[in-house]
Every structure is written in structure tokens, then in C-alpha cells.
Amino acid sequence: MKFKRIIKNILIGIVLLTALHTYGQQHPLYTQYYNNFSLINPAYSGSHGLFTATADIRSQWAGLVGGPETQTLSLHGPVGKNVGLGLSIVNDKVFVLNETHLFADFSYSIETSDNAILAFGLKAGGSFLNVDLLGLGIENDNLFSENINQFNPNFGAGVFYYTEKFYASLSTVNILKTKRYAKNSNVVSSASDEMVFYVSSGYVFDISEDFQLKPSVMMRAVNRSPLSADISASILWNNKLEFGISHRLDESISGLFQIRLTDNFKIGYTYDATISNLSNYNNGAHEFSFILNLGKTRKNASKIAPPFYWMKK
């Protein structure tokens, strides 16, 4: 019995280690990231000229018990001619780990010409981590006798340049490296939050009066992890309906869909089909987005909006 308990603890430790490294190496990134760009670049905050609320839901590794799930709620908008503010709440869950990120964004924009804007942004906040070791149901073992709760502050920064047709983004999150532990005194497993760098760009081509082609690329670099890249292309019809495809190198192929239901509300859906070794153990990922404009465009707001933002202003 003692030997079986040791083996069980080792297996649980391996699972915890995997989950911790999933968290430590991954900052929430949606396939339709441009719907909630301020999550990865605070310089985007306020760029719509009015306040925008966004809710995202992502279920990863569908069909696999304990697979990653993410829910996001964000709000950002202008508070002056050049200043934007934002707030985001992101909840991540995988296996017995649950983490909630709460961050505030600040941006300052400069009109470099009549049709171009350069914005700088800062992000500050922290993450609340809970490891539900008691939920494992292991009795009479001090190693799993209490849950783990941690708070880790962190910062981010970014630069965002855009015209009516083009954008380029450079940003970083997790500037402070923090360690995660699955046990206070007796460490079961640990991982680190590493600094994440994002580089992204996109362009809008006018195919006809009603159709536009929107290619984009997003690259993500994390210390001690392979470079990740999303290559996407979509077609926008009449500023109301958008559909396209995306490829995350060596990981997934995705189908994208968005529809504008009113002048100020649109919804989106994405299905990611896994092409890595995990494809035999899950049914891909589902992602839903809900975007709502609040109020009217401010009088002193810039006439230029980011090219991938196609809600009526």
C-alpha cells in the first residue's frame, strides 16, 4: 500500500508539474487576438475612440478532463485626446490549478501624421494562483494536506502603430519573473513565469467595394520555449460578416467567424483543430468572443481606428 501511494504521489506530481509549466510558459492568447488586443499590448487601450467591452471564452483540449479553460472580461476606452485606460480580468483553469489575472492599462497616443498614430502603453497588476491540492482527495498525506495560494505582481509594456489599413505591434508581458510552487515547504513541483514578447502586424486590402482581405501574423517568444507564430487571413464582407483561417505553427489549424449583429455589437467563434501529438487525446479548442461598444465616439477622438477594428464608430 505504501508503495502504491508513493507511485500515486509521483504521478500527481508529474501532472502538477505539467500544469504549472503550462501556466508558467503561457500567457493567455486567443486565436482571434485582435478582438482583445489590449490583453497583450496596453498601447491599444483607447484606440477605438469610445469604450469597448469584450468577453472571451476559450475551452482548450476539448474532450480531455481537466484541460485548460480561459474566460476574459475587459474594458478600455479614451479618457482624453491622447490618453486611454483599460482594465482586464482573465481567469485560467487547468486540472487543480486556477489563476486569476487582474491588470490595468494606460496608453498615450501621438498623431505622427494626418493618417497615422503611434501609441505607447504600460500594464500593471497581478495574478492570484490557487492550487486545490485538497481537491485531489488524498488523505493522510501531509504533502497534499493544504491548498496553495499565491499573489504575484507583474508589469507589461507595448508600442502600437497604426493607420487605416496597416498596424504593427510590439509588446511584452510578465516583465517580473516569478516562481510557482505546488507546496509551501515540501515542493511537489515548480515553474516560472517568463517574460513574453509579442510582435504582430496586419494589413487590410480592398478587393472590391464590399470585400476586404485581412492577412496578419502574430509571433510570440518565451525564454526556453520554441517560437510560436500565428498566420491568419480572413475576408470581411460589407463590414458585417468575416470568415477566415489561421495556422499556429506545429500546433493547430483554425476556422474563424465573426458577425456584426448591430452597429455596436458583434460576436465571433473559432474552432482550433490540433495537429500536434495531442490530437489523439482531444477534440481541439472552442473560442467565443462578444464585443460591445459603449456610448458614442468622443468628440476629440482621432478619426483613425485600428484597421482590424470594423465596428461602426
Name these PLM-found stretches:
Residues 25-313:
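Subset of outer-membrane beta-barrel
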Residues 1-27, 233, 312-313:
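Bacterial Sec-dependent N-terminal signal peptides
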